[in-house]
């Protein structure tokens, strides 16, 4: 099934997904919210700013500037903006989207002002539009270079999830489906916070024992919050949570882990953000998760500790001592 797809968001991840759709045989148009970035992609037929390893776009992928005037050409819209821009993108789409068009989101995080799930934002603004989330352990560079990758498509509408699954899947990119859109979102968002935590620990040279403990206890924290928000327990041992958590906490391709690494090595917040020189979703998500956990009375020691380092100038070494000397408990 050949489709025409609009991709809003031309960072590394949006571009990698646009490439995957083009490799799959679809006609794809990609748009950046920065006019000069669009002009560069149109002129050079690549996105060297975010994916320098891809010399030229395939013939089915092109940049587009005025997507609003051409909205009727597209069957589906893929939103791949940072979480900070998600709500405004959906609000703009409301003015142009047609009844037969539906949305796929590749954005991970929570709404920055209300701390709502992004699916809740989309459903509130576009209540009759089908919505699916694509998430899981996937670095953009590897997907763009057609290395084997497996992800999850989550939607309340299983038929739409299967449609999106078929849209993307080929011999290099395998999509599974789930109707647990809450669990898939919570896992994909909170793991970015814990990747910062893992980076801090690595920067302080705490070793692999600490790394393993952090991932395991971090997974328990994600699960506690997810269950409180209405997720299914089994989702958290799948690709959208455990898979993504393992990947993002363990490899420096992750901007969140690199950011934490710089903090652990002694940089200030601003120095570390400047060094990463790209969006660090976990920095913003930490505030959302902290407030959600407090609202729902969910204990998340690692997330709270990371929040204190990021927003209350707590010393990481003092935080580690506090974590290790907390009241002793049963694991479960």
Swiss-Prot record:
> Do the record's keywords include NAD?
yes
> Subcellular localization, per the record?
Cytoplasm
Pathway stated in the Swiss-Prot or TrEMBL entry: Membrane lipid metabolism; glycerophospholipid metabolism
Which residues are responsible for catalysis?
Answer: 191
Q: Which domain of life is it from?
A: Bacteria
Where the protein is mainly located, per its record? cytoplasm
Protein task: Catalyzes the reduction of the glycolytic intermediate dihydroxyacetone phosphate (DHAP) to sn-glycerol 3-phosphate (G3P), the key precursor for phospholipid synthesis.
> What is the name of this protein?
Glycerol-3-phosphate dehydrogenase [NAD(P)+]
- Organism for this UniProt entry: Francisella tularensis subsp. novicida (strain U112)
What is the organism lineage in this UniProt record? Bacteria, Pseudomonadati, Pseudomonadota, Gammaproteobacteria, Thiotrichales
């Amino acid at each position: 099934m050949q489709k025409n797809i609009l991709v809003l968001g031309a960072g590394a991840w949006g571009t990698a997904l646009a490439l995957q759709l083009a490799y799959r045989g679809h006609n794809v148009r990609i748009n950046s919210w920065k006019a000069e970035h669009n002009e560069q992609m149109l002129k050079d037929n690549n996105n060297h700013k975010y994916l320098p390893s891809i010399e030229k776009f395939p013939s089915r992928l092109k940049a587009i500037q005025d997507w609003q005037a051409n909205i009727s050409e597209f069957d589906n819209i893929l939103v791949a903006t940072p979480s900070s821009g998600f709500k405004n993108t959906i609000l703009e789409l409301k003015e142009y989207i047609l009844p037969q068009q539906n949305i796929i989101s590749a954005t991970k995080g929570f709404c920055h002002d209300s701390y709502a799930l992004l699916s809740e934002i989309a459903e509130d603004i576009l209540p009759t539009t089908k919505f699916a989330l694509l998430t899981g352990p996937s670095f953009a560079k590897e997907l763009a270079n057609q290395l084997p990758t497996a992800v999850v498509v989550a939607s309340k509408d299983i038929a739409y999830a299967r449609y999106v699954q078929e849209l993307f899947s080929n011999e290099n990119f395998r999509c599974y489906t789930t109707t647990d859109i809450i669990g898939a979102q919570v896992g994909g968002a909170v793991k970015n916070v814990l990747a910062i935590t893992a980076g801090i620990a690595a920067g302080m040279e705490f070793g692999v024992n600490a790394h393993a403990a952090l991932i395991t206890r971090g997974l328990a924290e994600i699960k506690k919050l997810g269950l409180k928000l209405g997720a299914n327990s089994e989702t958290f041992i799948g690709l959208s949570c455990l898979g993504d958590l393992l990947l993002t906490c363990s490899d420096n391709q992750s901007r969140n882990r690199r950011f934490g690494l710089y903090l652990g090595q002694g940089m200030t917040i601003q120095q570390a953000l400047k060094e990463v020189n790209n969006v660090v979703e976990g920095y913003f998500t930490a505030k959302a998760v902290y407030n959600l956990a407090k609202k729902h009375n969910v204990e998340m020691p690692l997330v709270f500790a990371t929040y204190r380092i990021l927003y209350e100038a707590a010393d990481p070494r003092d935080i580690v001592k506090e974590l290790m000397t907390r009241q002793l408990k049963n694991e479960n």
